From Swiss-Prot:
<dbReference type="GO" id="GO:0003723">
    <property type="term" value="F:RNA binding"/>
</dbReference>
<keyword id="KW-0614">Plasmid</keyword>
<keyword id="KW-0378">Hydrolase</keyword>
<feature type="site" description="Stabilizes transition-state intermediate">
    <location>
        <position position="23"/>
    </location>
</feature>
<comment type="similarity">
    <text>Belongs to the CRISPR-associated protein Cas6/Cse3/CasE family. Subtype I-E/Ecoli subfamily.</text>
</comment>
<comment type="function">
    <text>CRISPR (clustered regularly interspaced short palindromic repeat), is an adaptive immune system that provides protection against mobile genetic elements (viruses, transposable elements and conjugative plasmids). CRISPR clusters contain sequences complementary to antecedent mobile elements and target invading nucleic acids. CRISPR clusters are transcribed and processed into CRISPR RNA (crRNA). This enzyme processes pre-crRNA into individual crRNA units, but may not actually undergo enzyme turnover, retaining the crRNA product. Generates a 2',3'-cyclic phosphodiester.</text>
</comment>
<keyword id="KW-0540">Nuclease</keyword>
<dbReference type="InterPro" id="IPR010179">
    <property type="entry name" value="CRISPR-assoc_prot_Cse3"/>
</dbReference>
<comment type="subunit">
    <text>Probably part of the Cascade ribonucleoprotein complex. Monomer, retains crRNA after it is processed.</text>
</comment>
<dbReference type="GO" id="GO:0004519">
    <property type="term" value="F:endonuclease activity"/>
</dbReference>
<keyword id="KW-0255">Endonuclease</keyword>
<keyword id="KW-0694">RNA-binding</keyword>
<dbReference type="Pfam" id="PF08798">
    <property type="entry name" value="CRISPR_assoc"/>
</dbReference>
<dbReference type="GO" id="GO:0051607">
    <property type="term" value="P:defense response to virus"/>
</dbReference>
<protein>
    <recommendedName>
        <fullName>CRISPR-associated endoribonuclease Cse3</fullName>
        <ecNumber>3.1.-.-</ecNumber>
    </recommendedName>
</protein>
<keyword id="KW-0051">Antiviral defense</keyword>
Length: 211
């Protein structure tokens, strides 16, 4: 895997367009690994990091193949050199994590996906997803060692053929941060590669871990 940090230029018209629409952002970032995507060798994940005062927006991108960022428009972003990321996970290893995800449930009657409402429901969703993916949340004195740093709704327009404006969608985006433990290294690595939950094209699902 490869990790790239992009510092977007707010003066760039293309960057402003992408910041206003996650689908456009995903389309732009996909250009850096377009051939691998076409050949089915790629799984692009990305996350817009929390804003820090007046600092320019930062996007973290994870790819399975080495990206070519020369495809970006001139002045779009400051691109830090891609770094290879090959974590040697071990059972019992404890790590810090960050994840922006869409915690939701599917209604049995209609099959419609709806957002979870309470913090407890969202943390329980996270616990289940991590356990399915070879991790477990660490426990603190007051429960799972996790914080919800942001809880917002992304507003995006998804156009279908023949539509001019497209349908306005609201997608819940929750930023989790905390500590976890590796239970099954093989499943855990697969989880890092494929991401967690729905909404990958909206900048959701990238699970970042560090010692």
């Amino acid at each position: 895997m490869w990790l790239t940090k992009l510092v977007l230029n707010p003066a760039s018209r293309a960057a402003r367009r992408d910041l206003a629409n996650p689908y456009e952002m995903h389309r732009t970032l996909s250009k850096a690994v377009s051939r691998a995507l076409e050949e089915g060798r790629e799984r692009l994940l990305w996350r817009l990091e929390p804003a820090r005062g007046l600092e320019p927006p930062v996007v973290l991108v994870q790819t399975l193949t080495e990206p070519d960022w020369s495809v970006l428009d001139e002045g779009y972003a400051q691109v830090f050199p891609p770094k290879p990321f090959h974590p040697a996970l071990k059972p019992g290893q404890r790590l810090r994590f960050r994840l922006r995800a869409n915690p939701a449930k599917r209604l049995a009657a209609t099959g419609k996906r709806v957002a979870l409402k309470t913090p407890a429901e969202k943390v329980a969703w996270l616990e289940r997803r991590l356990e399915e993916g070879g991790f477990r949340l660490l426990e603190g004195e007051r429960g799972p060692w996790v914080q919800i740093l942001q809880d917002t709704f992304l507003e995006v327009r998804r156009k279908k053929d023949g539509e001019e404006a497209g349908k306005l969608l609201q997608v819940q985006a929750v930023l989790f941060e905390g500590r976890l433990e590796v239970v099954d290294p093989e499943r855990a690595l697969a989880t890092l590669r494929r991401g967690v939950g729905p909404g990958k094209a909206l900048g959701l699902g990238l699970l970042s871990v560090a010692p």
